[in-house]
Amino acid sequence: MGRAFEYVILGGGVAAGYAALEFVRRNGGASSQELCIISDEHFAPYERPALSKGYLLPQDAPRLPAFHTCVGSKDELLTEEWYNEHGIVLVLGTRVISADVRQKTLLTSSGETISYKTLIVATGARAVKLEEFGVSGSDARNVCYLRNVEDADKLVGVMRSCPGGNAVVVGGGYIGMECAAALVTNNIKVTMVFPKKHCMGRLFTPKIAEFYESYYASRGVTFVKEAAVTSMQISAGKVTAVNLGNGRRLPADMVVVGVGARANTGLFDGQLVMENGGIKVNGRMQASDASVYAVGDVAAFPVKLFGGDVRRLEHVDCARRTARHAVAAMLEGTGSVGHIDYLPFFYSRVFSLSWQFYGDNAGEAVHFGDLAPPGDGDGAAPKFGAYWVRDGRVAGAFLEGGSRQEYEAVAAAVRRGAAVADVAELERRGLAFATQATGGGGKPTCAWHATVGVAAAVSIAAFACWYGWQAPYVLKRDF
């Protein structure tokens, strides 16, 4: 038993939805048996950032279908009906257990063989489990990870089961920081444990990290840094305490784990070239086998801004843009679509804070603005940032509390590699270095993370609020 398609998208995350929309807009829809999306989830593709933000709100939290792709970029809401109307076959709740790149076939767990002429791999990444560090207990009823709706539903259920209880958050990265904020908002006491000296160690400078740690502490979060979980005490299928390598024992009514992710490349090991933990692709998002493209978290692609260095970037913006580019390259033919020119972009919003980062945090960090801890200032909303200067040019920029124009200005400074003649002068001018170079930011070309055509579910303003904790400004970056 089997089916054959011209194009198959393997994976049902953010990238799959944006690839489907790009396909329809360039191709006018899909004819019978032309395009298929295979996903092991039971839902059409959706905007995953909502899971660590609005989905965890104590009141009026959104649920599907309100945040299917592509509402996160102020575009169409792609429900299952949309896919049907445009001739796209959704194969949901289906796991692919093997792939044969040479034969161009995929074998599902039900025994069906699905063949393709062109494959887009959008398998994303999986959460790293504690067992990979020699700690058992991930199957406990109150231990939570966060990658999909099923995980988020478990997290919500566990939170509601222990109001006012103690949560241990293992990990100091994106998931840890955003989940910790959500737990506090749900009236749960939070202790964060991670092995580094500061939170967000892969991105933040120590100065920036100290600000956010102080802010979180002012909201009741306790930090246990430079410490690792060695075991968990379990009773009746639930964790009751977390034991650390330094001898401390932390009482726990629930545990949230965010210790990293690994790209889902296993189906293609030994068949496609890998690099940096992902499937290596060229600037057209094409893998070592010309019939295969890879997008999103699973793709390792050359970043022009970094001199063509191959990077794997785990963020929703990258998933959206690489998906669109791959479909454009796939449909337009060799040579007609150039290589992707991506400006790396990351953001987060927690409590009343909102930051964005562009480029690369390589080189000398030059801070600006007021990084005074909460309670030390005048009560105004914080606004500060940093530039990273490498070889006399701006390689990256971070900004907390910016306006639309200001975010656009710092992004433009990174994109053009603004020249820095004097680091001391850069520190003195701070944000003005970027905004004055663009005439005060110019006309905003940015948009709220909002939605069109979903008024029956939520208003545009309400969607913007829960999608990004009063969503961040997101640039429509065409430069």
UniProtKB/Swiss-Prot annotation:
The keyword Translocase does not apply. The keyword GTP-binding does not apply. Signal peptide: none annotated. It is an enzyme of class 1 (oxidoreductase). The chain crosses the membrane at residues 4-24, 446-466. One of its GO terms (cellular component) is peroxisomal membrane. NADP(+) binds at residues 174-178, 202, 260, 314-315, 347. SUPFAM superfamilies: FAD/NAD(P)-binding domain, FAD/NAD-linked reductases, dimerisation (C-terminal) domain. Pfam families: MDHAR3-like_C, Pyr_redox_2. InterPro entries: FAD-oxidoreductase/Apoptosis, FAD/NAD-bd_sf, FAD/NAD-binding_dom, FAD/NAD-linked_Rdtase_dimer_sf, MDHAR3-like_C. Keywords: FAD, Flavoprotein, Membrane, NAD, NADP, Oxidoreductase, Peroxisome, Redox-active center, Transmembrane, Transmembrane helix. Its cofactor is FAD. It is found in: Peroxisome membrane. GO terms for molecular function: monodehydroascorbate reductase (NADH) activity; oxidoreductase activity, acting on NAD(P)H. It is a multi-pass membrane protein. Its EC number is 1.6.5.4. Its main location: membrane. NAD(+) binds at residues 172-178, 202, 260, 314-315, 347. Residues 25-445 are peroxisomal. PANTHER family: APOPTOSIS-INDUCING FACTOR 1, MONODEHYDROASCORBATE REDUCTASE 1, PEROXISOMAL. Catalyzes the conversion of monodehydroascorbate to ascorbate, oxidizing NADH in the process. Ascorbate is a major antioxidant against reactive oxygen species (ROS) and nitric oxide (NO). This is Monodehydroascorbate reductase 1, peroxisomal. It comes from Oryza sativa subsp. japonica. The gene is MDAR1.
